[in-house]
């Protein structure tokens, strides 16, 4: 930049030779030149008619040693004495690696002409876009994508593109080069994947600074079968009105048919971030023929909120749960963002120049919105002062023409709505101030370009008006207007419009071509004499359409009809010749889940429009400002020069009609106008420019050298516009939740079952190579077979023409269905050995009733009513135009993907259907993650520059047998360099800035969050993320808390909850600490107050040995954090030391004994330090000692850690965060930076944003520690690491090279083996290796151990009459009893109840519990979000510690659910979240359980016929030998029944094997008693008696190997006969039977089975 400045000075000194006869020569170029791109420039001669040749050069800057481009052009009268040569800057000649801006010199020389202009360069050589096949994926699925690349002329390019995939945490997990014209392999998501929004980022290989991002979500989901749409009667709730609020409900199946069912509707109000439901609004609404309507009555709203005016500024929401008539499927939709307002409109100024020409018309574009930001149509508006009226169009805009007076320098403008139904005080109003255009040298010459048309589209002829005003002499010199049209950052066209003498208005017609999409700038100027230029410009929006053509339609009328699954059909593509067309067909159910990320023409134009280098909506401060703001660089032969551009991107481009741009344009103009001084206004405007480095306002202000006044104006405007931007980032509140069951359709009887149900398919690329027709359009027919889904497919085509850019066609829909079909509903996954109910819904869309037979096909992977030997069938009628749900109960026995198949046929007809789908079965147990973080730092931790280590495998003693272990090893370079800024988002701290209230303790609890949030945001410079105006509010809250705390300050400067209580050492120290921190932010906090508390602590609570004592514990023990536990003396002393140290900078001069007090206390702590037991106390003490400069050895501290990254105690999350924060502070104070990285990473990974009650200390410490880290941590070194990972059973190690350029890309390797592996690292810098081990752990017996609460939950059936039932089908009474297990009653306590699916709480019961004089509960809230189950939250003022507190209320079942998951009840302390207990409840479903037999984690289905004790009279010896010697029979025994036990619903018969008649798998059958397992239901049929002998044999498949033994299953294939004892064999009745048994034994024992 220094060279740049010298060059400009030299240029000004040398000057440029002008024409000898008074001509004016101009050179105009784009303000930014793109490399490797042809750019048009303009050279013009005014007042010179002599033909001449001009040489055009492009040189390097500043030395001009290289000629990068050269050409010659002829200028003559035939060309109106202007030329538009094309130049091109080759990137290969430049230093691309330079991090500084690069410029070139554009030079024009010729007779009497010498012009030069320095122009900024950009390496953006084109546009690149990514299309993914859909916008949402499940773990493990492939992400198909294609890349489209065009240059700035919208011509197709096949340059190599780098495509990266980034996790929601911003980690690059894949980066590879792709060729846009070639085949691209999909990116396969791993099974172990981060849920959330992922990014696919595309950028050119040689210009990575410009990128395009496609987004997609990753989560577990199933597709719905129908969608629900809500349409409120108004977009707002007008507070003064008396009308009820109506919401229309529309429900449609995805194949177009209307849904019959019922909707449950509840309204609520969202206040800040909290949803407050209106219990009385819960209504059951029938959905008839797909439609219903919900109503919120004003009285219902007042029943929840008595003063409706308090709701102004908040939003209404409505949650609707629609359940189909069969109860088989459910979709939840929520519509939010319905603003509660006093005025229903807001006004913005958009597409309005900031500058006006005095005495000329000023075109003011007003944009009126509803409160949700949507355009408000047909609203009258009026401007005051200069009167003008208009009415908004359908897009919310109205154009007002203001006739401005002469001789004014500023124009105050006020516009208000003029709606006839609103009183004046309720009308919306908006003001701005426009500034007068400054003429050159005060000449008073003006040009106003006016375009009055509103919606402009290709093919239009656009009238452009040139209005001039000036003195007569000047006007007589105007012979023509030169105009330039800029599009996509390039000069698209240059022309001249003649003017005749005396014309003050000249009009030309401009033909709009597709090349001018999406918008263009029209810049015009005229010259007066040889030195004055008068200019104006206007920005023009063009309707978003394709530049070319692309249409998708059915190849014939037959193809446009409703199709059958699997049918053949054809589509026809029509488009530009040579276009490559990418196709994809997507199930519309995917868009019900997520349609945010679909590629569209509008999104493409939005991206391309960013290449516009113009920065305003038109006009300019003066003639040069017109060119600058339009994105042009100008120089003239009379030294008229635009300012040098220093950034390619505009601080605020004039986006098209969008609310965010409206807000910013309007806000910037009005804010800057507040500064009358031109210099300060410039400082303000610069403050509102966006910083490309992302610096904070404060950091940017450090670079200002123009004085304090400029710096103050800069900061004020910078903070102001940041707050506006934050408001504009409000996300849409309309979202759709999904059913818990999948949406695709399955098969039937003897027909091949439908089994192909992709979410997207037809991923093809077709080229239009056919001969074009007379309209220049090529076509191609594409044949294909439809998939098996019954749905509507949306076929999306994106074409890339060689010359006309990208075109996204209107989607073509293909509806697939038939009159009779099955919809098989499967969950996303089920747990092995757990029963689940699935449903097949049979639809009959025929006009006649039918009779059907349905069958569940047997699969040995499931236990079901369908068995190998017996098919499970049901037969029933289905009425015309209706459906019927058929439930099937199954128990999955094997993990993995297994087929579920249902078939159905119609009696007497050929109609049938079959569906086969995969069901994912996951292992039992609790999915556990073990994370180990290892820092690789070979220069510090290595030997000879190499760090080698062996990573020991985790001990997984609790792993579920026969389940896989997945280990993922990720390596990331220098992970801590920017971790705070990237991971702790300041915008999420909004909830911490609250109003303090309550007693001396509660006030500190509620004041602390504002203090620590301000401390953290100040330290990290993140106020922009939260909104700069929030800092003022935070300071106000701090001062409120400070003032209130003074009420509880005693005369001796100590504190207690109330002044009549004894003073608390801990509370006084805490007040000292918080006020000391706050005093750095608020100067009004008295140092005397802080130091008074310090003095009281030292003189009244410190013992001679240095320890601090507590004589009066606080009431709110939860605010103590971890200090509340064991080792109280050490933790209290350490805590008070940290408070004294915090106050040292304030009180050291006032309190002479402060340092000696700290020394005494730290002497005591040093004696205790190595003997401490708790990790928390060790961390706290280490910080106190390190902060006092008494500790520099971290060995004891690190020994107390878990994994060297956290200080952890069981079941105490907030204490662990607090303790780890103390440890981080200690490490920072000791400057042990090598140990810091993993600790910071762990804290960040907790995603902990703090809270108030019960979280005070964790909140304070985590943000204090992270802020301190941001301040202290030295900048990271250059990175150049080579890492090798040798995994077991792999011969070749994984090798990675990590440097600064690729540090953020994660290198990941996975293995299924949980074994030791070795790692080697060498080089410079640091990297973090994260080992994530995921496995299924057996549930611990104490998994539900409760902390500080006892809880009992039960349900019982309730008989109700018709009135009491309230439309429900049944009811239960939920009984909850809890007791606090502390020494005193628990104060504020919350009971959070998760409802059973299909059940709603009885609001009247809850009201009775809360409204009576004997109030059992403080208040309750109901959230009937059926997607996540409804919830009831109950607030209790206290819970007794001496007796149970019980609550009973009814819950009503409103619809049937096939398999009800348990509900849960959680009780927890409002003040301490670690004190909690959770229990589950479920209606009794014992008789509905399928029978299965389990040993360990292996289960066998037992849902078959019982084995019957063989008592047939006609069984002879030969039959027994034949049966015993059958192929699959494994053994034949004589046994004695020793005992019978019952376990898990099964009978276990312990048999002693007396004789092995035929040996089998069990080689030691007689070693000990053998277990025979049978279902309980077979007990009576078997009728086995103790001490009786039995002949028994069974199949090999009925043997069950155990760890050191074998068990035997008794199934229908087991043969059992009673063997009479010796005495009975003497009886005539049993003699023949005993002889047969003896002969059977001898035959098989001696001779074996006959062959």
UniProtKB/Swiss-Prot annotation:
Site (Cleavage): 738-739, 1290-1291, 1307-1308
Residue ranges of domain NTR in the record: 1506-1649
Gene3D superfamilies linked: 1.50.10.20, 2.20.130.20, 2.40.50.120, 2.60.120.1540, 2.60.40.1930, 2.60.40.1940, 6.20.50.160, Alpha-macroglobulin, receptor-binding domain
Pfam families in the record: A2M, A2M_BRD, A2M_recep, ANATO, C3_CUB1, C3_CUB2, MG1, MG2
Region (C3a-like domain): 660-738
Signal peptide: 1-22
Subcellular location: Secreted
InterPro entries the record matches: A-macroglobulin_rcpt-bd, A-macroglobulin_rcpt-bd_sf, A2M/Complement_sys, A2M_N_BRD, Alpha-macroglob_thiol-ester_cl, Alpha-macroglobulin_TED, Anaphylatoxin/fibulin, Anaphylatoxin_comp_syst
Region (Properdin-binding): 1412-1444
GO molecular function: endopeptidase inhibitor activity
SMART domains: A2M, A2M_N_2, A2M_recep, ANATO, C345C, Thiol-ester_cl
Covalent crosslink: Isoglutamyl cysteine thioester (Cys-Gln): 999-1002
Post-translational modification: C3 precursor is first processed by the removal of 4 Arg residues, forming two chains, beta and alpha, linked by a disulfide bond. During activation of the complement systems, the alpha chain is cleaved into C3a and C3b by the C3 convertase: C3b stays linked to the beta chain, while C3a is released in the plasma. The alpha chain is cleaved by the serine protease complement C2b component of the C3 convertase to generate C3a and C3b following activation by the classical, lectin and GZMK complement systems.
Start and end residues of each stretch annotated as C3d-like domain: 991-1269
Source taxon at top rank: Eukaryota
Ranges where the Anaphylatoxin-like domain occurs: 683-718
Self-association and partners: In absence of complement activation, the C3 precursor is first processed by the removal of 4 Arg residues, forming two chains, beta and alpha, linked by a disulfide bond.
Cited PANTHER family: COMPLEMENT C3, MACROGLOBULIN / COMPLEMENT
Functional note: Precursor of non-enzymatic components of the classical, alternative, lectin and GZMK complement pathways, which consist in a cascade of proteins that leads to phagocytosis and breakdown of pathogens and signaling that strengthens the adaptive immune system.
Protein name: Complement C3
Organism: Naja naja (Indian cobra)
